[in-house]
Amino acid sequence: MSTAPRYTINRSIVILRYKQAFLDWLMSADPNPPQDMTLDDLGDDGDAFMIPGENVVDNMQDAVKWVEKHWGMFFEHTLEGWLVDESLWPQKRTLKMFREWFTIEYRSMVWDLVNAPILTEDWEESEDGAEDTLH
């Protein structure tokens, strides 16, 4: 019996890695900034996002285009993960700022190593009750 990964998921993965500009902003905006925070500390447990796979996102260039098309959602999700008080967020967020604050990593293959159904959890509903997701 083989123990090698057997099933792939029809998604790709992107990870946003923080750049120094994000750390500088966080340390200045947070009323109680973590002492001695480094970029390595920030990257210890970041989110991984499943995005469309084959036929939509086939390579790094496609992944960057896809993320940049949805940059506002990624930006707000990340900011909220650090500071829930939106008044502390940069008010004039732009794609240029997004590019200065984050590096995009891309993985084309997502392997499912668990022999059980994938369960999803809706973390937020829109005001009208409809799903507030990109899919």
Predicted regions and their residues:
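Extended, charge-biased low-complexity segments
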Residues: M1-V57, D62
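Generic N-terminal initiation segments characterized by hydrophobic and/or small/turn-forming residues
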Residues: L23, W71-G72, E131
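Short acidic DE-rich linear segments
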Residues: E124-H135
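Amphipathic protein-protein interaction modules
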Residues: G53-S126
